[in-house]
Amino acid sequence: MASKFDLHSLVANWQNSSATAKAHWSGTFDEYLDIVKANPKVTRNAYQRMFDMIVEEGTEVYIDFKKEVVRYKFFDDKFNNGKDAVFGLDVQLMKLVNVLKAAALGYGTEKRVILLHGPVGSAKSTICRMLKKGLERYSYSDTGALYTFEWVDEKLELDGLLGKGVKVFPTPMNEEPLLLIPDDLRASVFEQLNKGQEGTYRVNVDGELSPPSRYIFKALMEKYDGDLMRVFKHVRVKRLFLSEADRVGIGTFQPKDEKNQDSTELTGDINYRKIAEYGSDSDPRAFNFDGEFNIANRGLIEFVEVLKLDVAFLYDLLGASQEHRVKPKKFAQTHIDEVIIGHTNEPEYRRLQDNEFMEALRDRTVKIDIPYITRWRDEVNIYKRDFNSQKVRGISIAPHTVEMAAMWAILTRLEKPKKANLTRLQKLKLYNGKTLPNYTEDNVRELRKETQREGLEGISARYIQDKLSNALVAAQQSNKGSVNPFMVFKELESGLKSHSLISDEEVKAEYRELLGVVMQEYEEIIKAEVQRAISADESAMQRLCGNYIDNVKAYTQKERVRNQFTGNDEEPDERLMRSIEEKIEIPESRKDDFRREIMNYIGALALEGKKFNYKMNERLHKAIELKLFEDQKDSIKLTTLVSNVADKDTQEKIDVVKTRLIKDFGYDEISATDVLHYVASIFARGDVKSK
């Protein structure tokens, strides 16, 4: 019999944990000063805290086409199992973190709006969501701890200063407790707190209290004849935990119909119920400081589609960024400490550039382009996260299905190369790290530099995800058991007819043409895999390669070759060498160059104490495979699959090939059978050679 679920012990352990105890810590102002003295980082401003949050997750430095790139592991989203992980934007994220670093050090970017700019579906919202979730998590950690305060009147001795019958009045904008120290006293207090400190950040809190706290502070100072220590007796400091759901330290603002939206959503509004209690609509206690700017204090405010906002809101944004102040109705400018980040799509940004009245906003923004991914393997990672065997149950996804969809997406985003002899597909492969003849890393860097808008146009990842989902559902409904690239190609093409963001018929025609390029590439891939499965006899390949190398060595050194069977010395077998070289289109005029290249490569390996293997040379490897395939394909009679007439011996050989496809290339029974039938139809047409 299964044991009962013991919730009580789990709750007891949770409540007794040190983390829970720290989470509910509260103390006096003096106790808080001791905390600050021991750890000045608790007083960091919003930019400093966000920068540290990202960096503390770790970094990885790598070289991308001779350029050093820092990858910030924070954006791997490991705490959420990679659900929001950002792929392929390391350079752009590095720029974002550099902006945050400059702001953290007070170099000026803390007075700017960070504007993420890019096409729809390019991860702008995802980046903001990760920053918000990260701040929530960080505020619960020891390294990310921050504090605020509340006013207390346990004995109700303040004559309703905090409100009728109110014993606890939380400061509405989550201010830093050190703001309670009067301006003319701060320098000496901070000097004492910073004595002996050698860290990056020193205690240097800027700003002032929110209007309600300033009102209460002044009233208490008057009541106690300026005795600050007695005022502090009514202050209780507590840990502050940021939460978007609870509207604490994290705010989100998005445009709506301008008739139903006004600036009070940003800066708060009068609490008419409280006016009767306090007698005036200008009493700060009768005002709800719950606008997005107010509640986001100490953290982050995200402006969704920021450039769609009415101009009236943009004035609030200008003051908030440059001066770190907002103007609630009937109150003085109020200090805020928060990261201001917005994002926008291309059409709205062009409007900003064309509008002379928006010049002030342009001057106060730091634009960071967040384009579509242009590296194939990164795009594949996006789809593998959602379309894998763990998430997709009851139906298989054939090898290359996701990869081919990703390839098409990348091709639509790449600009046509200016070099006439370079195709977009070759450009994609170069960006993906593949080497091509006559192209160095410097050439690839030049390719990137010559582009104007690469990654800012094309098909979004969302469209691909939608069509992959459609193909999966259609396959499940028809009981096909497996989704293959051709099913996805069909969905991708049919979806173009009604694509909401592409109205230009020429662009649609171009994208269809690129889909044809991807289909051709897929055919080449599966032809090569079937050929390799047929010629997958490792010992036969090694024998053939050894025979070829022996003959090439003799040819280049003008020697004879010992015949293994007769023992006689013979001339190099020109027919054998050419039958292999022709498979990779080495012309007669270049055979000597190719053979010398192979021998030089083998010689260079020998100097390093390494032994040559045919797999080390991609072109020779391919040639050996194709030669062996040609020698064996007639015995397997793959084309009998087309006519569905195969004798027992042939079927057994075909089953061996299918088993190799499953074992070596990741196919299952259904997809392996489908691929064999399709490749057999290609071979039946006589199209055997792989490019």
Model-predicted regions and their roles:
Residues 1-57, 118-121:
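N-terminal accessory segments that target, anchor, or regulate ATP-driven/P-loop NTPase machines
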Residues 40-691:
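Conserved ASCE/P-loop NTPase catalytic core
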